[in-house]
């Protein structure tokens, strides 16, 4: 089909008018994780081991694998609801493993809250409310040492409030970490909201380089959460201060 340039331009403008009129609906797709990871991969950043914390059924790791196909993917998930899906995903794949546990500052146990009505909403925050039970907890440093994983690492956290504790238990991993992907929030305790969390992650030696999938809450369409992508502070993208 051979269309004139004027028709193609009109079509593009019409599409953008639709997107601009429905920014909340389209933002997570335009600013998708896949697009962010593609940009990071295009920068030549390599990862040997990807640690996916809050992995649910493994869909994020499967998506990331299209950009780092030779990496080993280790999934950490606390909610036993996902055990069957993770077993099926990793059964015949030596480059994909999982641990059924929460991640935290140290090995042990932790309270955990989730609901089968919302299996993507789990948290190990102790004041999260019912239903709550005790699950195994691992630190990423100990997990990596136990399983013999090697960097460079990518670490992704979708953990609903326990990011500081998980990072505290990953000091050695962070020394060899090239990419951090962290879901951050606009509500809750100030120290766990995205402004303070971005400062905290920068204090650990990283610089925010991308973002993805902003979400607006149902209650009043206020900004709720977004995923930030961090690289090491000494990378060229982090050091260069100009727009052009």
Model-derived features: positions:
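Phosphate/nucleotide-binding beta-alpha loop and adjacent structural elements of enzyme active sites
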Residues: 1-244
């Amino acid at each position: 089909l051979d269309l004139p340039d004027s028709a193609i331009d009109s079509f593009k403008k019409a599409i953008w008018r639709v997107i601009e009129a429905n920014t909340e609906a389209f933002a997570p797709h335009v600013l998708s994780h896949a697009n962010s990871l593609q940009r990071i991969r295009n920068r030549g950043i390599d990862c040997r081991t990807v640690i996916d914390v809050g992995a649910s059924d493994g869909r994020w790791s499967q998506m990331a694998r299209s950009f780092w196909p030779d990496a080993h993917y280790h999934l950490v998930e606390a909610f036993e609801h996902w055990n069957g899906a993770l077993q099926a995903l990793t059964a015949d794949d030596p480059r994909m493993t999982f641990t059924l546990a929460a991640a935290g500052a140290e090995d042990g146990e932790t309270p955990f809250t989730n609901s089968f009505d919302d299996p993507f909403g789990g948290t190990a925050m102790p004041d999260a409310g019912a239903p709550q039970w005790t699950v195994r907890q691992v630190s990423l440093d100990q997990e990596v040492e136990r399983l013999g994983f090697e960097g460079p690492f990518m670490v992704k956290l979708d953990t609903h409030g326990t990011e500081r504790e998980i990072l505290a238990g990953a000091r050695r991993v962070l020394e060899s970490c090239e990419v951090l992907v962290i879901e951050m929030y606009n509500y809750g305790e100030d120290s766990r909201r995205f402004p303070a969390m971005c400062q905290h992650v920068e204090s650990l030696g990283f610089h925010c380089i991308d973002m993805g999938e902003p979400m607006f809450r149902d209650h009043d369409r206020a900004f709720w959460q977004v995923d930030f992508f961090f690289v090491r502070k000494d990378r060229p993208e982090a050091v260069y201060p100009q727009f052009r």
